[in-house]
């Protein structure tokens, strides 16, 4: 597993050293004898190789993150499903009821609360 974390950086490092000329071996024949066997990569080949390495690294990190979320999600569902005793169920129902009450108050209650709002007439007391 540790190798896969290091492999993108290793590949990029090798590519950089290769382009810098550090990893090129001494040729047995002159480069002028056979121009088709060039030891350098073109700009397009470098871009394609670098893009592939970065894409592989991003996919690897996405898989690791997804696995972490799945393991966290499974532990949370196990904790939620273990709530079968009386106080736990009561607390859960109380939370649902409080959320429903807030929703009803926010959507159905008028903001101008006075006697006329509900159809009642305010009668002044005659002295």
UniProtKB/Swiss-Prot annotation:
Sequence intervals crossing the membrane: none
PANTHER family membership: CALCITONIN, CALCITONIN-RELATED
Propeptide intervals in chain numbering: 26-81
Record's keyword annotation contains Isomerase: no
Native organism taxonomy: Eukaryota, Metazoa, Chordata, Craniata, Vertebrata
Disulfide bonds: 83-88
A Pfam family annotated for this UniProt entry: Calc_CGRP_IAPP
One GO CC term, this protein: extracellular space
Protein name, per record: Calcitonin receptor-stimulating peptide 2
GO biological process, one term: regulation of cytosolic calcium ion concentration
Polar residues: compositionally biased ranges: 72-81
């Amino acid at each position: 597993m540790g190798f896969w974390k290091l492999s993108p950086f290793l590949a990029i490092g090798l590519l950089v050293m290769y382009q810098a000329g550090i990893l090129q071996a001494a040729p047995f024949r002159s480069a002028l004898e056979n121009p088709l066997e060039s030891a350098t990569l073109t700009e397009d080949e470098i871009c394609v190789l670098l893009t592939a390495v970065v894409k592989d690294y991003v996919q690897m990190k996405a898989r690791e993150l997804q696995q972490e979320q799945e393991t966290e999600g499974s532990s949370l569902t196990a904790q939620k499903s273990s709530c079968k005793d009386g106080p736990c169920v009561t607390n859960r129902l109380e939370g649902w009821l409080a959320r429903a009450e807030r929703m009803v108050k926010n959507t159905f209650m008028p903001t101008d609360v006075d006697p006329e709002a509900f159809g009642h007439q305010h009668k002044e007391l005659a002295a």
